[in-house]
Amino acid sequence: MAIAESFRLEDGFSVYAGVRATRDAVVEDAAFAVAKLGGADGTDAAEKIVAALIRPDVSIIMLDGCIVSFYNWIDGEALYAKFQKPVACYVFEEPEGRVEEAVRKLFPDWPDRLRAIEKLGSPTPYYTKAGYKIYVRSWGIDPIYAGKAAELAMKLGKMPEPLRVARIMAAGARALLNTLGLRLVNGH
């Protein structure tokens, strides 16, 4: 299973898309949710998607980042505790080191937000056989095995195919909402 998001700051919300895929990355089902930009509901949005897609044969929940939606976040540990499936959060670019500075500057609730983000832990670098470097946080699975799981699902470049498809679907859903002129109230 894979969850990714798409947002534009002017929208005020982020669209999350999730896919359930087979081991060879064939997509079987999809689900969507929304979260507020700069909100604290990223984990809730991810939980809705997992609840809609979960089956006993799901072996891992892949996340396209944990710090999402303009400093919202997805708590991988909470997903692991709730669904009892390994969770891996991947970052495909060098993580930026200014999260703390930005959070302090932008959010009145910065102490709580920073605690939640710091609880995610530091990512572990993983090097693929093709020479890509990805960063992994994981719960219920060793980060190296989570990196191997990502590598096994890579078809085009360094992103696992289910995450790539989920990202495309999230962007498409966001574009559809904008094309239809739909505005979400309070991020929902």
Curated annotation (Swiss-Prot):
Signal peptide: none annotated. Transmembrane segments: none annotated. It comes from the Archaea. Disulfide bonds: none annotated. Gene3D superfamilies: archaeoglobus fulgidus dsm 4304 superfamily (3.30.2170.10). It holds the Pfam family DUF99. InterPro entries: Endo_dU. Belongs to the UPF0215 family. HAMAP family: UPF0215. This is UPF0215 protein Pars_0148. The lineage of its organism: Archaea, Thermoproteota, Thermoprotei, Thermoproteales, Thermoproteaceae.
